Amino acid sequence: MRIVITIGGSILLKEYDNKKFEDYAKIIRQINEDHEIFIVVGGGRPARDYISVVRDMGETESICDEIGIQVTRINARLLQLALKDVSYPAIPVNFQQALEFSATGKIVVMGGTEPAHSTDAVGSILAEYVGADLVINATSVDGLYDKDPNKYNDAQMFSEVSADKLMEIVSDNDTKAGTYEFIDKTAIQIIKRSKIKTVIVNGNTPENVKTAITQPIGTLITE
């Protein structure tokens, strides 16, 4: 299968060390034995910190996005280094480059591409562009909920949810840089039109990404 894996920056950079990068590299190498892999990495805390500084300078949200994108590419480079020789030794800046790099048979790791696109959106667009069979979104919680589980104890997780229902849930969310709490509208629209199987899992345990390929786990988004 051709698989796109999106990994939130907060997953890889909960602590400023190499452990999570190495843990993910180990699992991804295992998956790569049987599948073709593309990876999209988010910005996490470093991106939020830099964006906060830029926003305090009075810059536009587009500039904030630009800074965030640069951070995602640094994070992507760190994961690419952890993967060593199984990964392509450069970070693509657009989807065409990602597809071209994949022709080498190497794992392709990338960060953001366009302003106002979350990691989820980039992963979904990449999946459509390269004709992926599966998207696995590694987040900081067990799946998708009807509201933020970090704020509400009564939040209910979906084992399966339609793209239309998801759109209702996120319709009131804003799109400020670095503030994506669920999965953004662009990602949902791409999932709906492309009909690519998408699974949301808890990425704090890297093994969950491998499990999602063959077993029910987290939240399955349906068209």
Swiss-Prot record:
Protein residues bound to UMP: 43, 65, 113-119
Gene Ontology biological-process annotations: 'de novo' CTP biosynthetic process; UDP biosynthetic process
One Gene Ontology term of the molecular function aspect: ATP binding
Gene3D superfamilies, A to Z: Acetylglutamate kinase-like (3.40.1160.10)
A Pfam entry, by short name: AA_kinase
Domain of life: Archaea
Protein name, entry field: Uridylate kinase
Organism: Methanosphaera stadtmanae (strain ATCC 43021 / DSM 3091 / JCM 11832 / MCB-3)
